Swiss-Prot record:
Regions of this protein lying in the Extracellular compartment: 23-222
Record CDD domains: IgI_N_ICAM-2 (cd20995)
Family label: Belongs to the immunoglobulin superfamily. ICAM family.
Region (Required for interaction with EZR, MSN and RDX and co-localization to microvilli) location: 250-277
A Pfam match: ICAM_N
Organismal lineage: Eukaryota, Metazoa, Chordata, Craniata, Vertebrata
Originating gene: Icam2
Keyword DNA damage: no
Name this polypeptide is given: Intercellular adhesion molecule 2
Bilayer topology term: Single-pass type I membrane protein
Signal peptide: 1-22
Length: 277
């Protein structure tokens, strides 16, 4: 045997020997999606390059159903569902008494289902301050969320949120402004959840439009006219009340006052009518 053949045989023995530290076979895991919504289901494939694996499968704390399997068990396809949080999945196979596994982290997202916008106060005069407040229902992952406060088509503020939260979180953005004449426009808030870094897409949700009612301050002459008119109306009202009271008293006296006393005096006997000297 040539030296080259001996050297090649030695490498093969070293490669397949249990103590060589090299992997005798490979395990692969593939997911239909890298990020999923908590309510959806998707497919995961587990496969190996072992020609005749002893056994294999998918380890997961969630619900799973095996859909298909290779006749020799070289690959298996599963339908996974009911994932409520970020989860690590493991594909494992046993080949010639040796076991090997591969893992895959699947992220879970929750879209911005409800976006609410409030104007505080909803009615202002030109030059007064007001606040725009936008609140979004629990979202995950929060670090991929952007809230945009809009006046018409103009963006007033974009707010992002840091930190990698493991559970859905509410988010709020506020913007303080001074009312202008042009502020009688529609205000709105847009929530954007960007899942592209995780193999997903952009999810957008927008609030109902809110209109800020802006009033012009009254001029001095207008205020004077209003005060004069109100004063005249108040004077006429008070005068009419007093006249009604006076005429009512006069009518009452005519009915029960002077004429009543005179009639009673005439009914007295003549002896009692004499006036003392």
């Amino acid at each position: 045997m040539s030296s080259f053949a001996c050297w090649s045989l030695s490498l093969l023995i070293l490669f397949y020997s249990p103590g060589s530290g090299e992997k005798a076979f490979e395990v692969y895991i593939w997911s239909e999606k890298q990020i999923v919504e908590a309510t959806e289901s998707w497919k995961i494939n587990c496969s190996t390059n072992c020609a005749a694996p002893d056994m294999g499968g998918l380890e997961t704390p969630t619900n799973k159903i095996m859909l298909e399997e290779h006749p020799q068990g070289k690959w298996k396809q599963f339908l996974v569902s009911n994932v409520s949080k970020d989860t690590v999945f493991f594909c494992h196979f046993t080949c010639s008494g040796k076991q090997h596994s591969e893992s895959l982290n699947i992220r879970v997202y929750q879209p911005p289902a409800q976006v609410t916008l409030k104007l505080q106060p909803p009615r202002v005069f030109v030059g007064e301050d007001f606040t725009i407040e936008c609140t979004v229902s629990p979202v995950q992952p929060l670090e991929r969320l952007t809230l945009s406060l809009l006046r018409g088509r103009e963006t007033l503020k974009n707010q992002t949120f840091g930190g990698a939260e493991t559970v859905p979180q509410e988010a709020t953005a506020t913007f303080n402004s001074t009312a202008l004449k042009k502020d009688g426009l529609n205000f709105s808030c847009q929530a954007e959840l960007d899942l592209r870094p995780h193999g997903g897409y952009i999810i957008r949700s927008i609030s109902e439009y809110q209109i800020l009612e802006v009033y012009e301050p009254m001029q001095d002459n207008q205020m004077v006219i209003i005060i004069v008119v109100v004063s005249i109306l108040l004077f006429l009202f008070v005068t009419s009340v007093l006249l009604c009271f006076i005429f009512g008293q006069h009518w009452h006296r005519r009915r029960t006052g002077t004429y009543g006393v005179l009639a009673a005096w005439r009914r007295l006997p003549r002896a009692f009518r004499a006036r003392p000297v």
